[in-house]
A protein has these predicted regions:
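Acyl-donor-binding surface of acyltransferase catalytic domains
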Residues: 1, 68-70, 80-148, 278-282
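Phosphate-binding active sites in nucleotide-utilizing proteins
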Residues: 175, 186-197, 201-210
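Short amphipathic alpha-helix that is part of the acyltransferase structural core
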Residues: 1-34, 132, 145-174
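Conserved acetyl-CoA-binding loop-helix of GNAT-fold acetyltransferases
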Residues: 85-98, 221, 227-240, 244, ...
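Conserved donor-binding loop and adjoining core beta-sheet/short helix segment
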Residues: 24, 36-94, 98, 197, ...
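Conserved active-site alpha-helix within GNAT-family acetyltransferase domains
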Residues: 113-130, 228, 232, 256-274
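C-terminal "cap" of GNAT-fold acetyltransferases
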Residues: 133-156, 248, 253-259, 267-285
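Conserved hydrophobic beta-strand within the GNAT/NAT acetyltransferase core sheet
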Residues: 108-111, 216, 250-254
Length: 285
């Protein structure tokens, strides 16, 4: 039985095992780390993590990303089985929101990846902001390659800083990648290419693979170089490489309101597969 109030503390290294054990053993878990494993994210200090205690028992945790342009993601959330999730979520969120306000963070967002999240976050004042849709491609039949002045080549480690800079210009908050996310995305990508003009990177793509299924994780073009078919060239090259690797299916996520992105993918044979994820937001006063 939970007490009237939980004790909220800041995560420290000594709590690592308890947090990971709760993550593995509970059904009340949300994880949105993209390219990172939970332990890796914790060890890298890539955000702030708060813990909820009932005496010496860990009842829950919440992990928020480092802010970008005043926005922070809820990357981790876990509640111990057998507790009252609503109470734990409420107290963790109250503490997280207070810390965010102190740090000048204006918005907290979360992807509704599991069906138990919406009810509790609605109570906390979060609301549906937009949808992240999934598009799939089967068969890998390609239109002719576009003619572009940009050169497409494999990305190298020295390109990562330029890729991160392009990403921040190409996307609005909260969709921009932090530098550490870009570095990890590059390390784990099956395919990473950049488009250059006069030896300067102006666009990039990152793709991953799991067995015979590929995923276009990121595609971004510097705003000054849009409408030059560079995105089409990067996509065509990625699809050609995927076909060479005998991938049977590809997927990509994009925002429901990003019609330009959707039209590009549709031209190359992608279609919406119905797997949409809601993004919820709370503005911190």
């Amino acid at each position: 039985m939970l007490g009237a109030r939980l004790k909220i503390t800041v995560y420290e290294r000594q709590h690592r095992s308890a947090l990971l054990d709760l993550t593995c053993c509970s059904r009340w878990v949300h994880k949105h780390l993209d390219w990172h494993e939970t332990g890796q994210w914790l060890d890298g200090g890539m955000g702030q993590v708060l813990l909820a205690w009932n005496d010496d028992k860990l009842e829950g945790y919440i992990g928020l990303s480092e802010p970008i342009a005043g926005w922070s993601w809820i990357r981790l959330l876990g509640i111990r089985d057998g507790t009252m999730p609503g109470m734990v979520v409420r107290e963790l969120c109250e503490a997280a929101e207070f810390r965010c306000a102190e740090q000048g963070i204006s918005n907290i967002v979360i992807l509704m990846t599991t069906n138990w999240l919406p009810a509790y976050f609605r109570e906390r004042g979060f609301s549906h902001e937009e949808d992240l849709i999934t598009m799939a491609h089967i068969g890998l039949q390609l239109p002719p390659a576009p003619t572009v002045s940009a050169r497409i080549r494999r990305a190298q480690e020295p390109d990562v800083a330029a890729m991160a800079a392009i990403d921040r210009l190409a996307f609005d908050a909260p969709w921009q990648l932090a530098d550490y996310d870009m570095r990890q995305a590059f390390r784990t990508a099956t395919s990473a290419t950049v488009a250059t003009l006069d030896d300067e990177a102006v666009a990039y793509q990152l793709s991953t693979r799991q067995e015979e299924i590929g995923h276009l994780a990121r595609l971004a073009v510097h705003p000054a170089h849009r409408r030059k078919r560079i995105a089409s060239a990067l996509l065509h090259q990625m699809l050609t490489e995927s076909k060479r690797r005998n991938l049977t299916e590809l997927s990509v996520n994009t925002q429901l309101g990003n019609w330009q992105s959707q039209r590009l993918y549709e031209r190359y044979g992608f279609y919406r597969n119905g797997y949409d994820i809601e993004l919820w937001r709370k503005q911190i006063r």
